[in-house]
Design a protein with these regions (language model features):
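Amphipathic alpha-helical protein-protein interaction segments
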Residues: 12-175
Length: 175
């Protein structure tokens, strides 16, 4: 991904421009004159994963830029993009169901998910505003939500597999 290469080279503006272009290209109603604009959550869009990735990537770029230059506006923008990524992820998960599995999401966005919690914690540490503390908890809760959905899907598959429940419980005890 070109934008990630820009982040690695500490070229944050071109990285953000790249991620913003990705959003503009897949959301017909979204127009942005700068890299700070965040589009509304999309209820129906065939490019859900591109949208989620662009939000997480913008958050990562703003966080890296903050860590380099200590501009609090960059930290705020990182948080806004992480929030948008999580909200889009929930809408997408509800729309797609099993096709958007927790292992796929965690594998694809693990670093960004961890950085989102770090971002909220840094904002809380800098401002002591309880809202940012709530954001950190909210991000952790959303990660737990993905874990619960994955566990429910595994349980449903086990119930529909024809395997007697007592054997499944024995297997659990063996683990």
């Amino acid at each position: 991904d070109r934008g990630k290469l820009f982040i690695d080279k500490r070229m944050y503006r071109p990285a953000l421009e790249d991620f913003q272009r990705a959003l503009i290209s897949v959301i017909p109603s979204f127009e942005a004159n700068d890299n700070f604009a965040v589009p509304e959550i999309q209820n129906e869009n065939p490019y859900f994963l591109t949208i989620i990735a662009a939000h997480f990537n913008k958050g990562d770029a703003f966080l890296a830029w903050f860590n380099r230059e200590k501009n609090p506006q960059h930290l705020e923008q990182a948080l806004r993009n992480y929030q948008a990524a999580y909200h889009q992820l929930i809408v997408t998960r509800n729309a797609m169901g099993d096709e958007l599995s927790k292992p796929f999401l965690m594998g694809t966005f693990q670093k960004s998910i961890e950085q989102s919690v770090t971002c909220a914690r840094q904002l809380y540490g800098a401002t002591h505003n309880a809202r940012y503390f709530q954001d950190a908890f909210h991000f952790v809760e959303l990660t737990k939500y993905l874990n619960v959905l994955d566990a429910l899907q595994r349980a449903e598959r086990a119930n529909n597999s024809g395997i007697p429940k007592n054997l499944l419980l024995e297997l659990k005890d063996v683990r």
